[in-house]
């Protein structure tokens, strides 16, 4: 209701508004040194870094990209030098210039991130983390720090501006993690089998038991933890046995973390159905089908037997499936013969001895055959015959039978014969394992006695150890193109152990698809990118059915030819000596080396390379037709997404919630200030917004070397100038060359799961289209992230067309004058609340959005007229719930009619409108609207209901609209339930918006979900009419009624998208599945092309001239180039595209002012004087004068008072309105360019923020950010302010249409929708 303005919270902020960014001083020159190891021993680099940091905890040192970088921020102090005992060679001594991080030339096609910049940022963060771990007991948790006491995750982002300002951004994240063993019942082994993550590398494991035994080699683990992760264990240590895949090892309990929900006993039982009577028929059919298949194939269905891993024999790997897996995937592979297994299965055949030989063998290759065998980037059927047909040589493409290679086979020595005999034994073991299950018991008798094992390692099978490493890095279901576009790639730590331990180190973070096959680096990188998708590829060839028996149920290919003559190719290509071959058949001993190998694999594991979630086969298979199953599944997911987007918080528990970042603790800020001393200063929001880029011209390389003559700084942009080392070896080799071409942006400031992709070695800068914006280019992996190969991308350069006929060929970047003009303007402003248009008393009126909550109270009616309907409510069988459903339906009918939405006719056979159903055969063929009560409390149950609705709609004889509602709205076992009048009105308005208009002329047809809504945002009167005909696009290109908004989010398997106009008349959402169970995998470009085609279809019915495409998360350069290519197809329309990246959880954390008031004074200037009345507030803004004789009645109250005429003074009643004090939003436009990714100089064109006060914590604000990555406007801040106003209106639509909670509305509805759908489908 109306509140006097004097009681409103002060939402105009002042300069004391704290922004949690610390400035640590200004540095114009930063000396540095680089070292490499000529012997290629990367262990020495890590040892040197550890030793330098041990001697001086404040030293800036970091091992990065096969080089050791040392820096100093103090004037007159040289950077730390590496000790001579590490045998490192100094390659460069120079000065890093911050001005090299800003592109200034418009002709540059690429802006390379200087290698020294990334190393410097990592060194600064490592120094701060070292201080926190020593002083405040923080524990490394992946790439961040965690406080075990509270479970809060601490993030640190360092940045060096082109002007030399060193900024440190800090924020904390509340998580559900807590230290395992914190609760007494955990240590007491009351919970065995609890899922935990192993800090500091976040390897997932399962708890076996707790013990007080201490590992025999405890000093080794303590030194490794201190050296690799700077973790120092406490005096009293409790140890826990953790199973990681098939290995069981001991780990300190204080480095194990468990989800708080599972620790408190909230297990999967809470996710069961609300009504246990129902059972989906599709699951029953699937289970029956699987039982029949298992019986026909002779597979033992005993779960206890299936859960036991297959032990290896004679040093070979087990061919049994991993524990806990089912046969559903293998059964589907038998049905879909066109889906081939891919090379990630091949390395399983390599024996441990050969693996050791390959690790120590010199680097080699296939010579001139590299281009012939592996040069192509296109997936062909020959690729799969090469790797998967392990049988005869009819499909051999390695050239063994060509050019006299038969002579080489005749010269094979006894070693090759032994290898073939070993392969024969391996195949015999496979056949026996496949045909006779009891063989497993015979093999188990050969295992060593458990009493002989040490306390530190409970399982000692080297084959299982290999399975652990492979399972950790299995990426067979990851879509390479999409993963490169949406996932963050973090530089993995170098495999390292202390120098006195010399053994093989298996580093899971560096495992690749073809890591065990030797060829040149360029061909290997192309093959890794080519097969990064893994899993399966669709090859439409009928001949694939001829090899029907070539695959067993485990997914490994068996020999289809003569078993006595065939040898696996990966074994045939190994050159092993006699000693190595003899080691393969010997049973390995339990020694310290094996223990070190396990610990090193754990400590070098990279959690960002964790494989994507497997597709749940139980939810994808409904009948024998694979294409029909896939279609039904995607349609069911689409229905599920539509119901959840506009749910009015009814399905709030189904979608995982994401917490906003919080300010860091005072203890953390104090530690950071102690590290940097007096130079540390906290910035206010105004100071941060007014910061400008004061960098100079682009300089070649990371800086001019001190010991190099002037004018010798050759090379292109971003190339470091180096000096020759003592041995005469040029520093451009080895690690230095990788530094020049392999500089990369790691992680992302947006979220841990979004970021950039590293640049492969040997890749060359690509040409850009004519409408490319060079100001945001950076070094990215074009081969991995782009949907098209690099060569094809260069060939298609001429195919790019301008954005519009009136758009200049070269899109400009923000100039210095642009940001100078932005500095003169106010960086912050309050955005006006939009007005809504609807009907009242037959007249079209407009009012603020809070009035929509009192729709029936004020007698409002929809602006598009009534929509009559026939209503039927389907509820679960039961007498009690039937009475509650009938009462709810009557209330719903009365509310719908009372709001003026139309006349409601009750359906059903008896005219009551309620129909009971067992949900096994859901009948959706009824006329009108079906309200389906949803008894499920979990996502999978809701998906089964959506499947039944999708299957029923295909057989329906008439069109019906289906709306699902949770049963908990009107029914409960323990209490009477009835929805509130406000919720009931919101549900009725939501139903009205989803109904098609009664007019026969439908504007959009059935392509959108919401059309002809009850109310829309009122169109304001334009301030001017732009009638000029200009040759070029004007700065204010975004005119009113000319913009269509598109937002999308992408993951490894899903892409969610939403369309919206700026007034709320159009709304559409869609979910795209990239990895379906049958059919080809879809690429990012294919889906984006379909998104653009839908945009053109919607644009054909409106007068839209501009399209804004927003990506939730980071957008790589190749993804942007793909969008520019796709958007060049306009079908004769004049369309100007804008491309943005948005973040609904930005890392910028802003808290309240120090005076304790809500907010501060961002807009600047004094706050207006609070009025005491409506008239005074509207007229003069000051308090009215006192009235004498106030106890005497005025004579006017007894007489009729006439309405004043137009010419007379009147009271302005515009202030008499219903307002929402939580809906006041401010915008912040930055005066500088923000980096798009963490640890990189890839800058956006312009950045803006939307902020509002949090309802829970008045001293903390909710923040939303958006950044231009491509914009046709010259003055970026003008376009940014336009978009901030546009997004502010879409935020209001999110609150009024039920997409989000109105009090927490800070994200535009289409961005909130794609994020909501993505969080939902990720649970499937």
Swiss-Prot record:
Residues 546-566, 618-631, 724-743, 785-816, 1172-1184 have a biased composition (Low complexity). It holds the Pfam family Med13_C. Residues 298-331, 750-784 have a biased composition (Polar residues). InterPro entries: Med13_C (IPR009401), Mediator_complx_sub13 (IPR051139), Mediator_Med13_N (IPR021643). GO terms for biological process: positive regulation of transcription by RNA polymerase II. Residues 296-346, 386-455, 535-590, 607-631, 694-816, 1151-1198 are annotated as: Disordered. GO terms for molecular function: transcription coactivator activity. Disulfide bonds: none annotated. Residues 408-442, 567-578, 607-617 have a biased composition (Basic and acidic residues). Keywords: Activator, Nucleus, Repressor, Transcription, Transcription regulation. Component of the SRB8-11 complex. The SRB8-11 complex is a regulatory module of the Mediator complex which is itself involved in regulation of basal and activated RNA polymerase II-dependent transcription. The SRB8-11 complex may be involved in the transcriptional repression of a subset of genes regulated by Mediator. It may inhibit the association of the Mediator complex with RNA polymerase II to form the holoenzyme complex. This is Mediator of RNA polymerase II transcription subunit 13.
